[in-house]
UniProtKB/Swiss-Prot annotation:
Residues 165-223, 714-781 are annotated as: Disordered. The keyword Ligase does not apply. This is Putative cell signaling protein. Palmitoylated. The keyword Lipoprotein applies. It comes from the Eukaryota.
């Protein structure tokens, strides 16, 4: 056997369709499409089934900790999607994100202080801000602690702390008070003297509460907790100011709060807000989503805030205090250096004393009402059993993968390697083929276009990997002998195979002799030992004991690629005789060219990884050094810092690669819009199929897309699409049936599609075409046929008359974009791409099909 897994033409069409569906999903997401709750539930079922299948199929090779991980992972996925579907009932989050993306209005805030006027103008709360705020809450543990402490402190104000402390005193004081109350009740029957005695007893009780030391102690404790909360707030503000990517989301959130307050007051003060219907609908969706998460309506809280705003409109003192508090929060969060200044502490103390006077004075009842509502919401959210179970599952996964040693957090390396060893084969089994619809290579000497490249994942990956590590250390106590250390790693990868069938190619040699243009179909086989890669990496230091980081982690010393067995079979070509004569030298050229290009690609990839890895390490180490001055409990773990820095670096790299990819000499075109050499048309099926799925992925209304029907059909959208098959909600469920049954169906379809009579071309309605494509994935029509069928359904075209055929004359379909022959007819490429009817008539050697 030449390769480990030979290409099976009977299943390659179906398997490559899975890869094209992945491309279409990426296209849909890139264009703002999102899966619905039902579609996400199908994805969750697929992930759960995959995790269970790994544990089931590898029973003899799996350890108990790994089995526990896959079990916990299945439970986490199930509970996550169930909680999400329950809280997000009605696709609230998707609707909110879509409305935010469609909003044209902006939330503009006037100048609140002169230092940051320009920065506060035209801040839009967008979907990117929503994502960054979510990441901020997820990554910043101090912010989560701050929110929790604020809610707890606010909830403590629902009842009179001093009264609680008084009721918790010893039995003697309680009995005295109870006896006093009973005595008052008994004497109430005695008329005016009893009422006077009751007043006297009541005033004594009030004096006890007022002068009680426990009440004063509780008040001081509350004041101290508020001071601690402010210190935590300053610490969070300093962290946010040190990360530029959070500045815009924080400003946008503050503007959103200003806008909300402006709506409560029903009039504009110093803040003006511009809005539109999309923005208002987005806020309604988000409000409903928050209520579902908290398990309680926010209407009472909003009504209370409206009453507070109404009080502020009628009380200048309260209004000034609220406005000063808002401006103070802005300064601390946005003005660099202000949080650490003495001016901020003085202003905080001033605002705290004034607030204590107002909230514990004439607005005490309103403040208790607000605190009570916040506590009810907090209690309702914390008592959610589903969320508690979800956090329990998350802790189990965290414990399976993370270990704590010496106060530091690190990954369980052996566990992660075992998960990869067990999971990767299952993933490769599910995705056997990796399609590349079109590959374009532009060089000064030649242009090459390849289509219908269906790579087998099991063949492309090396079957054997070897690593060898060599260490060399030299040191001496004498100054004239330089200490030296070097580490060298040798990597050997072999049995990298490839079996490509029916590859459509176009090649044009622009310089040298001879210049020629050719196109055709070729089979490429790299088998047996296949491609062998030998890579040598080294890391060295000129000094034995150096503390500073080197410029890089490793250096690529040598890359050697050998291709031991390559076979090229040219099935169709415009220059068959010439290629047959030049085949020996051509094989040598192809082998050396492929090996050289692979060497350059591997070297470039490792050098880029080294640069990015070094920058990530350098930035993370700098942040860790800054955190070292903080208390131990406030320091972030190294794993978390590295993960956050790596995520930010990879995101920036992805954006820059998009811009550079447009001018790259080697391009992978997923659909027609990505092609640069669009004047070159090859008879490949993958590019047309990818284009169909791309158009269908963008065809859904608003944020819906039929591309996500691969997970599960969305009832809210028309499931009449290329994804509406009988596969159900499983991602990798395969079509049943043997090769014989598939071939017999193909023969029946071929007989069925014959023209009904001379001079006519039989077509089918769109529903019939979809039924045929569902019955067998191989019976695939191109984009031109789809467009033609749509016109027939609309009634624009009923029958296409064709002139009668001559004797022994063959007719070529005009509904299929294909080139009939490469070997018999030596046509020029310009003729193949021409839209001139006369040239097309020459090409097909027949009259035009449509007059």
């Amino acid at each position: 056997m030449a390769v480990a897994y030979p290409t099976d033409k009977h299943v390659v069409h179906e398997e490559t369709g899975k890869g094209l569906e992945v491309y279409s999903i990426w296209t849909a997401i890139s264009n703002g499409k999102m899966p619905s709750n039902k579609q996400l539930r199908g994805l969750g079922s697929s992930l759960t089934d995959g995790a269970k299948s790994v544990a089931k199929e590898r029973q003899k090779k799996i350890s108990d900790p790994a089995r526990k991980f896959f079990s916990d992972f299945s439970k986490l996925i199930d509970n996550s999607f169930n909680v999400f579907a329950k809280k997000n009932e009605g696709d609230l989050l998707q609707n909110a994100i879509y409305e935010l993306s469609q909003a044209e209005g902006s939330t503009n805030v006037n100048e609140v202080w002169n230092d940051i006027t320009e920065d506060m103008q035209s801040q839009d709360f967008s979907t990117e801000d929503l994502k960054q705020l979510f990441l901020l809450i997820f990554n910043n543990g101090k912010l989560r602690t701050l929110l929790q402490n604020a809610i707890v402190l606010l909830g403590q104000q629902t009842t009179n702390v001093a009264s609680k402390k008084l009721n918790e005193q010893d039995g003697k004081k309680s009995d005295n008070l109870r006896n006093g109350v009973n005595k008052v009740k008994q004497n109430m029957r005695n008329g005016a003297s009893a009422r006077d005695q009751a007043r006297e007893q009541g005033s004594k009780a009030k004096d006890k509460i007022k002068n009680d030391p426990d009440a004063q102690k509780a008040k001081e404790e509350t004041k101290q907790k508020l001071q601690d909360l402010y210190e935590e707030f300053k610490s969070v503000a300093v962290d946010l100011q040190g990360d530029p990517k959070y500045q815009h989301p924080v400003r946008s959130l503050l503007n959103l709060i200003d806008k909300f307050i402006d709506k409560l007051s029903e009039q504009s003060g110093n803040v003006t807000a511009d809005t539109n219907e999309h923005y208002d609908r987005a806020m309604q969706y988000l409000k409903q989503l928050v209520e579902n998460i908290l398990n309680r309506s926010l209407d009472n809280l909003i009504d209370t805030l409206k009453q507070v705003q109404h009080d502020a409109e009628n009380d200048e003192e309260l209004k000034d205090w609220l406005e000063s508090t808002r401006q103070f929060v802005r300064k601390v969060l946005l003005k660099k250096g202000y949080a650490k200044s003495d001016a901020s502490d003085k202003e905080f103390n001033k605002l705290r004393d004034k607030g204590d006077e107002l909230l514990n004075g004439r607005y005490k009842k309103r403040w208790q009402q607000l605190s009570s509502e916040v506590k009810k919401i907090s209690d309702s959210a914390s008592s959610d059993k589903d969320v508690k179970q979800l956090f329990s599952n998350y802790k189990n996964i965290y414990g399976d993968l993370i270990k704590r040693e010496g106060g530091q957090i690190s990954l369980k390396t052996s566990m992660c390697l075992e998960i990869l060893r067990l999971g990767v084969p299952v993933i490769l089994e599910k995705m056997q083929y990796f399609p590349i619809p079109r590959l374009e290579i532009e060089q000064p000497d030649f242009d090459v276009v390849l289509e219908n490249l269906n790579l087998q994942t099991a063949n492309v990956l090396p079957k054997l990997a070897e690593f060898r590590n060599n260490n060399f250390v030299r040191f001496s106590p004498y100054a004239n002998i330089t200490s030296f250390r070097e580490n060298m790693i040798n990597v050997h990868l072999s049995n990298i195979q490839c079996d490509l069938k029916d590859v459509n190619y176009y090649i044009k040699r622009k310089q040298g002799f001879p210049t020629f243009t050719d196109l055709g179909v070729v089979d490429l086989l790299i088998g047996k030992q296949g491609m062998v890669v030998n890579l040598t990496l080294s890391s060295f230091s000129n000094t034995m004991f150096e503390n500073e980081l080197p410029d890089s982690f490793f250096k690529v010393e040598d890359v050697k690629v050998d291709i031991h067995h390559i076979k090229l079979k040219i099935r169709k070509s415009r220059h068959r005789l010439l290629l047959a004569f030049l085949k020996p030298s051509l094989m040598t050229y192809v082998r050396s060219t492929v090996a050289r290009s692979m060497e350059l690609s591997i070297r470039h990839a490792f050098e880029q990884v080294d640069r990015e890895w070094y920058e990530i390490h350098k930035e993370a180490k700098s942040e860790i050094e800054k955190d070292s001055s903080k208390p131990t409990e406030d320091q972030e773990s190294k794993l978390k810092v590295y993960g956050r820095v790596a995520y930010s670096r990879i995101s920036n790299l992805h954006k820059s690669s998009k811009e550079k990819g447009k001018d790259s000499q080697v391009r992978v075109a997923l659909h027609k819009e990505n092609t640069a050499l669009n004047n070159i048309v090859l008879p490949s099926g993958n590019l047309q199929r990818s284009e169909e799925k791309r158009r269908a992925a963008l065809s859904g209304s608003t944020w819906h897309s039929p591309a996500f029907n691969i997970f599960g059909v969305d009832d809210s959208e028309d499931s009449d699409s290329p994804w509406a098959t009988d596969r159900g909600s499983r991602l990798y469920q395969r079509t049943k049936g043997s090769v014989k049954s598939r071939e017999s169906r193909l023969k029946k379809e071929k007989h069925k599609n014959r023209p009904a009579s001379k001079g006519t071309y039989t077509t089918y309605t769109s529903s019939e075409e979809r039924q045929r494509s569902t019955e067998d994935p191989l019976s695939h029509d191109t984009l031109s046929r789809t467009i033609l069928n749509d016109q027939i359904v609309k009634g624009n075209v009923t029958e296409i008359p064709l002139p009668p055929l001559a004797v022994n004359e063959k007719r070529a379909s005009v509904a299929v974009s294909s080139i009939p022959s490469f070997g018999d007819d030596q046509h020029d490429i310009e003729l193949l791409n021409s839209t001139d009817p006369r040239k097309n008539r020459i090409l097909y050697n027949q009259p035009p099909a449509v007059a």
